[in-house]
Curated annotation (Swiss-Prot):
<keyword id="KW-0350">Heme biosynthesis</keyword>
<comment type="subunit">
    <text>Homooctamer.</text>
</comment>
<feature type="binding site">
    <location>
        <position position="319"/>
    </location>
    <ligand>
        <name>5-aminolevulinate 2</name>
    </ligand>
</feature>
<dbReference type="GO" id="GO:0004655">
    <property type="term" value="F:porphobilinogen synthase activity"/>
</dbReference>
<feature type="binding site">
    <location>
        <position position="223"/>
    </location>
    <ligand>
        <name>5-aminolevulinate 1</name>
    </ligand>
</feature>
<feature type="binding site">
    <location>
        <position position="239"/>
    </location>
    <ligand>
        <name>Mg(2+)</name>
    </ligand>
</feature>
<keyword id="KW-0627">Porphyrin biosynthesis</keyword>
<dbReference type="InterPro" id="IPR013785">
    <property type="entry name" value="Aldolase_TIM"/>
</dbReference>
<dbReference type="GO" id="GO:0008270">
    <property type="term" value="F:zinc ion binding"/>
</dbReference>
<dbReference type="GO" id="GO:0006782">
    <property type="term" value="P:protoporphyrinogen IX biosynthetic process"/>
</dbReference>
<feature type="binding site">
    <location>
        <position position="212"/>
    </location>
    <ligand>
        <name>5-aminolevulinate 1</name>
    </ligand>
</feature>
<feature type="active site" description="Schiff-base intermediate with substrate">
    <location>
        <position position="202"/>
    </location>
</feature>
<protein>
    <recommendedName>
        <fullName>Delta-aminolevulinic acid dehydratase</fullName>
        <ecNumber>4.2.1.24</ecNumber>
    </recommendedName>
</protein>
<feature type="active site" description="Schiff-base intermediate with substrate">
    <location>
        <position position="254"/>
    </location>
</feature>
<dbReference type="GO" id="GO:0005829">
    <property type="term" value="C:cytosol"/>
</dbReference>
<keyword id="KW-0460">Magnesium</keyword>
<comment type="function">
    <text>Catalyzes an early step in the biosynthesis of tetrapyrroles. Binds two molecules of 5-aminolevulinate per subunit, each at a distinct site, and catalyzes their condensation to form porphobilinogen.</text>
</comment>
Length: 329
């Protein structure tokens, strides 16, 4: 019997039908993998659209409660809350973030009351939204971010957020020693079960641009003395390993799409879950292309999220969390 000249190995066999492709899929994307970032602003009477992020708003307390309930009903895995205070409440040390009556802590209590343990309630643990200079920390007399003074404020922020009902605190300022200090502070205050999601590898990225509008940032200058250089993968792994040593329960890479190599490397070394943040600029980029009918928004979003999961992210923060949950179910 003569051998066929055609290939015996035909990978297309495993792509022949929808059912076959589903059976052999190597990467899953489910609503539970997704976390919805949400913004809540003080002093507004109705949701305020964020022009650079079409479809995303700064919520009032009431609209936040409705949107959060809808996200939970859609099956989204968690909610990450950012507070936007009034300009007159900002100061040099971010006091509004620690104030129990500050917008973020009040909103956390609202959602903790409404949702209980039906979702994972996360809080951004940083000062940039609350400072009049827009930096992620306390400035010294030369105008530089004072690492240790900032970490002390982060501990106060984290404890205030835990007291308000956060299940997860997310230190995002990239200060040295922040995870260990926050862990010690939470434990001393009795919040031993509150999870720390460490922004372990946060790069100084151009893709944060729309976020500055989202939180009404007062920043002038840049954050390159504490956020990482985009080309430094080995440094990112060092930061991840330091945060793991300090007790991080989850480590995150931010942004996501331009840093999938770092996500993959983090997944290789991390014994705890790895998260990745599909940031505002990534969202705006796809939305703009879709608005011009240059790409199919749904297909592009699901492909991008699948790529982040394929790289090794267990959790993906995305402004499409609710939309994607609907598309996936």
């Amino acid at each position: 019997m003569s051998m066929s000249s055609y290939p015996r190995q035909r990978p297309r066999r495993l792509r022949s039908t929808v059912a076959m492709r589903r059976l052999v899929a190597q990467t899953s994307l489910e609503p539970r993998h997704l976390v919805l970032p949400m913004f809540v602003a003080d002093g507004i009477d109705e949701p305020r659209p964020i022009t650079s992020m079409p479809g995303v708003v700064q919520h009032t307390r009431d609209s936040l409660r409705r949107a959060a309930a809808a996200a939970v009903a859609a099956g989204v895995g968690g909610l990450m809350l950012f507070g936007v205070p009034r300009d007159q409440d900002k100061d040099g040390v971010g006091s509004a973030g620690i104030d129990p009556d500050g917008i973020l802590n009040v909103a956390l209590r609202d959602l903790a009351k409404d949702l209980g343990e039906a979702t994972v309630l996360m809080a951004d643990t940083c000062l940039d939204e609350f400072t009049d200079h827009g930096h992620c920390g306390v400035l010294d007399d030369r105008g530089r971010v004072d690492n240790d003074a900032t970490v002390a404020r982060y501990v106060e922020l984290a404890v205030a957020q835990a007291e308000s009902g956060a299940h997860v605190v997310g230190p995002s300022g990239m200060m040295d020693g922040q995870v260990a200090a926050i862990r010690d502070g939470l434990d001393a205050a009795g919040y031993i079960d509150v999870v720390i999601l460490a922004y372990a590898a946060k790069f100084a990225s151009a893709f944060y641009g729309p976020f500055r509008e989202a939180v009404s940032s007062s920043l002038s200058g840049d954050r390159r003395t504490y956020q990482q250089e985009p080309g430094n993968a080995a440094e990112a792994l060092r930061e991840i390993e330091l945060d793991l040593d300090e007790g991080a329960d989850i480590v995150m890479v931010k942004p996501a799409m331009g840093y999938l190599d770092v996500v993959a490397a983090a997944a290789d070394v991390s014994p705890v879950p790895v998260a990745a943040y599909q940031v505002s600029g990534e969202y705006a980029m796809i939305r703009a292309a879709a608005a011009n009918n240059w790409i199919d928004e749904r297909a592009a979003v699901l492909e991008s999220l699948t790529g982040i999961r394929r790289a090794g992210a267990d959790i993906v923060l995305t402004y499409w969390a609710v939309d994607a949950a609907g598309w996936l179910t």
